[in-house]
Curated annotation (Swiss-Prot):
Pfam families: Anticodon_1, tRNA-synt_1, tRNA-synt_1_2, tRNA-synt_1g. A motif ('HIGH' region) lies at residues 40-51. Belongs to the class-I aminoacyl-tRNA synthetase family. InterPro entries: aa-tRNA-synth_I_CS, aa-tRNA-synth_Ia, Leu-tRNA-ligase, Leu_tRNA-synth_edit, M/V/L/I-tRNA-synth_anticd-bd, Methionyl/Leucyl_tRNA_Synth, Rossmann-like_a/b/a_fold, tRNAsynth_Ia_anticodon-bd. One of its GO terms (molecular function) is aminoacyl-tRNA deacylase activity. Gene3D superfamilies: 3.10.20.590, HUPs (3.40.50.620), Isoleucyl-tRNA Synthetase, Domain 1 (1.10.730.10). The keyword Kinase does not apply. ATP binds at residue 579. One of its GO terms (cellular component) is cytosol. It comes from Brevibacillus brevis (strain 47 / JCM 6285 / NBRC 100599). A motif ('KMSKS' region) lies at residues 576-580. This is Leucine--tRNA ligase. The keyword Transcription does not apply.
């Protein structure tokens, strides 16, 4: 007999919705648990089977914590701004808002069909003006605190499309759409000063319960380096340039300098004879992405400016070159080259026949650069010193001479925040007719995104909003001056930087969230999502959160106390699921054929939650068979409760497996080891099928432990057991440590180390009692008759070995 998943799931989903079963409780005196999923971008493709893996994990924890008496916050929403909707709108002429709403409705239906215990009254959508009012408000605060500024930044400009492209839209120097040439062009952009928080973003990682691999990725992205800034004068010019180096001790080995093609001094210092060559090189460089420019495998290119820098430590003339492997966005946009001890500088020097001067003993620099340690040579005052001594001495000298200073730098760049797009949050800035700019007053927020059919690029590099004159041109309500609205919009990251705060108080129109509620719910106890957000989303969120902490909006320094990355569900052929490969599994199909509980159970039983595992239809069938077996254990052929389930004090047959199951399942759910927790539920079911009598309390508690994984079946069985209330708030079972110990244990009796007999004895038997039992055993007595006992070895709980001759 099998249960009808379609009927059961529909019945309980309606019950939960009508009764608002999962409305967040905020009872005083209860502990809190905030379980958060990385909310999805509602794409046109709908949910795939990878989404429910993480969602089921947080749902199991949320359901268990409710039963353990916690106030649980378990919300869901939509990260709904972004490029795909705008692209769709451009291609079809449809409104991205309508497209997005349609996709959200699909996602919501699919997620509800999986029985997740979300509080749908807290649903948020980043494209809702009630939500993005507060995204804009945070921007105004960043601006007021000097953390949002306008800068000239090199962007990917596509003349044919008349728009700026994101890095991921450029492939091999051409636009992904249409294959048009793309070039690098400096444009005024909004930038957020995340670098002001670099040190704290780095240091506070140590306090977080996150996978070490993710913390390491963030550390590398922030990229802290200690070294010195050194100033180089330019022969025949008043100007100078600064380089940052982690190895100021190698300054004596510098033989040339390199500027990025975009460096502001290039035009000034290039000599007339080199002008044509330099201009041709600059034109070539602007067609390449940063990634292409810094590729170590590519051949080094460059051009000489004809100008010379002066080495501050020895007065030597260093030719100044331009090369595209130096980026203006990284460091100071200029480097001192020490080819004897740096592989990239060495290759460049060999290509252009530049001098190579060894200043650290070791290696063979006629063959390759020597990057190892050694004594300093050819280095004047540093000769004979090791690396640490020489770095320290050189920095002291530079500071004393006014030629440089000790410096800590970060690989982390300030965050390029503006997008030349329509489908994003408008940036709340007014450009006044007197040339000044200011934030829009809070009373005027939100600045609504205007509805328009015209979302094609402006052609000027501004966003399509620049085309809407009646929206752009306005009056500043405070000064009465004419003003132009900022036409750039925010990136998709903006809305996801703080959404977890809005879930705490989603309908507040007076503040981002009530401070008392933020105090009650933060930090997030568990955050589960894919590792693809390891760096940017998590780093940006931490940055905004720290800023909000500094201005007194949030009570914690960090948003996410514990983070867990679920693995990827691959296609049956072990390849990543994708439409093009035709191996995508649609959850709607599985819910129809096998049921939502089966899908949840299977995804949790596939293997460790953080492993990437191939989808298996056999495994799915196995999960369904187990749930049918559970149903038959509780429900007879007549549809009534199994007669073996009774109120009884005779629990001997099931007692130990019951306490073992409660202990293991509780600990495994807490530790996100759902696959081994399910294995223990299977052990319980196997024992239950063998038992003559099934104590009702044990069976009820089994249903409680099953229900976080298979909630629809859990509710159905709970009702069959005679309950009129949902199982969702039934008290989570507890175990007795004393009942986990086996009363009896099987031991082996050996003669001269060979197994001869097995014996059941009391588990607390002493060595002496074990020896006595062995000697009195009939079979053993027969086998040792007439022999001399040399010694008897007893190992409690395991064996007795009688040595005879």
């Amino acid at each position: 007999m099998v249960f009808s998943h379609r009927n059961v799931e529909k019945k309980w989903q309606q019950y939960w919705e009508q009764n608002k079963t999962f409305k967040t409780s905020e009872d005083e005196g209860k502990k809190k648990f905030y379980a958060l999923d990385m909310f999805p971008y509602p794409s046109g493709a709908g949910l795939h089977v990878g989404h429910p893996e993480g969602y089921t994990a947080t749902d199991i924890l949320s359901r268990m914590k409710r039963m353990q008496g916690y106030n649980v916050l378990h919300p869901m929403g939509w990260d709904a701004f972004g490029l795909p909707a705008e692209q769709y709108a451009l291609d079809t002429g449809n409104d991205p808002a309508e497209f997005t709403e349609h996709n959200i409705n699909t996602f919501r239906r699919q997620i509800k069909s999986l029985g997740f215990s979300y509080d749908w009254d807290r649903e948020i959508n980043t494209t809702d003006p009630h939500y993005y009012k507060w995204t804009q408000w945070i921007f105004t605060k960043l601006y007021e605190h000097g953390l949002a500024y306008i800068d000239e930044v090199a962007v990917n400009w596509c003349p044919a499309l008349g728009t700026v492209l994101a890095n991921e839209e450029v492939i091999d120097g051409k636009s992904e759409r249409g294959g048009h040439p793309v070039e690098r062009r400096p444009m005024k952009q909004w930038v957020l000063k995340i670098t002001a928080y670099a040190e704290r973003l780095l240091a506070d990682l140590d306090e977080l319960d996150w996978p070490e691999s993710i913390k390491e990725m963030q550390r590398n992205w922030i990229g802290r380096s200690e070294g010195a800034e050194v100033t180089f004068g330019i022969e025949g010019h008043d100007e100078s340039f600064t380089v940052f180096t982690t190895r100021p001790d190698t300054l004596y080995g510098a033989t040339y300098a390199v500027l990025a093609p975009e460096h502001k001094l290039v035009e000034q210092i290039t000599v007339p004879a080199q002008k044509e060559a330099v201009e041709a090189y600059l034109d070539q460089a602007k067609r390449k992405s940063d990634l292409e420019r810094t590729d170590l495998a590519k051949e080094k290119t460059g051009v000489f400016t004809g100008a010379y820098a002066i080495n501050p430590v020895n007065g030597e003339r260093l030719p100044i070159w331009i090369a595209d492997y130096v980026l203006i966005s990284y460091g100071t946009g200029s480097i001192m080259a020490v080819p004897a001890h740096d592989e990239r500088d060495y290759e460049f020097a060999k290509t252009f026949d530049l001098p190579i001067k060894q200043v650290i003993a070791g290696g063979d620099i006629s063959k390759e650069a020597y990057a190892g340690d050694g004594e300093h040579i050819n280095s004047g005052m540093l000769d004979g010193l090791n690396k640490e001594q020489a770095i320290s001495k050189m920095i002291e000298w530079l500071e004393a001479e006014g030629k440089g200073n000790r410096k800590v730098t970060y690989r982390l760049r300030d965050w390029l925040f503006s997008r030349q797009r329509y489908w994003g949050e408008p940036i709340p800035i007014l450009h006044l007719e007197d040339g000044t700019m200011k934030v829009v007053p809070e009373s005027e927020l939100p600045i609504m995104l205007p509805k328009t059919k015209e979302i094609k690029p402006s052609g000027t590099g501004e966003s399509p909003l620049a085309n809407i004159a009646e929206w752009v041109n306005t009056i500043d309500p405070e000064t009465g001056m004419k003003a132009r609205r900022e036409t750039n919009t925010m990136p998709q990251w903006a809305g996801s930087c703080w959404y977890f705060l809005r879930f705490i108080d989603p309908h507040n129109d007076k503040a981002l969230a009530d401070p008392d509620k933020l105090k009650e719910w933060l930090p997030i106890d568990i955050y589960i999502g894919g590792a693809e957000h390891a760096v940017l989303h998590l780093l940006y969120s931490r940055f905004w959160h720290k800023f909000l902490y500094d201005i007194g909006v949030v009570p914690t320094k960090e948003p996410f106390q514990k983070l867990f990355n679920q693995g990827m569900i691959l296609g049956e052929n072990n390849e990543k699921m994708s439409k093009s490969k035709g191996n995508v599994v649609n959850p709607d199909d599985i819910i129809d054929s096998h049921g939502a509980d089966t899908l949840r159970m299977y995804e949790m039983f596939m293997g460790p939650l953080d492993a990437s595992i191939a989808w298996s239809t056999k495994g799915l069938d196995g999960a369904r068979r187990f749930l049918d077996r559970v149903y038959r254990l509780f429900v007879g052929d007549n549809g009534e409760l199994n007669e073996k389930i009774v109120e009884t004090s005779n629990v001997a047959g099931m007692e130990r497996v019951y306490h073992q199951t409660v202990k293991k399942v509780t600990e495994d759910y807490e530790g996100l080891r759902f696959n081994t927790g399910i294995s223990q539920l299977m052990v319980f079911v196997n024992e239950a099928y063998k038992a003559e009598v099934l104590p009702k309390k044990f069976m009820e508690d089994f249903v409680k432990m099953l229900s976080p994984i298979a909630p629809h079946l859990g509710e159905e069985l709970w009702e069959k057991l005679g309950h009129s209330e949902s199982v969702a708030y039934a008290a989570w079972p507890t175990y007795d440590e004393a009942k986990l110990v086996e009363d009896e244990v099987e031991i082996v009796l050996q003669i001269n180390g060979k197994n001869k007999e097995k014996l059941l004895i009391a588990s607390d038997s002493t060595k002496e009692q074990m020896e006595e039992m062995a000697k009195n055993n009939e079979m053993i007595n027969e086998l040792i008759e007439g022999k001399t006992i040399v010694k008897v070895i007893a190992v409690p709980g395991k064996l007795v070995n009688i040595v005879v001759r």
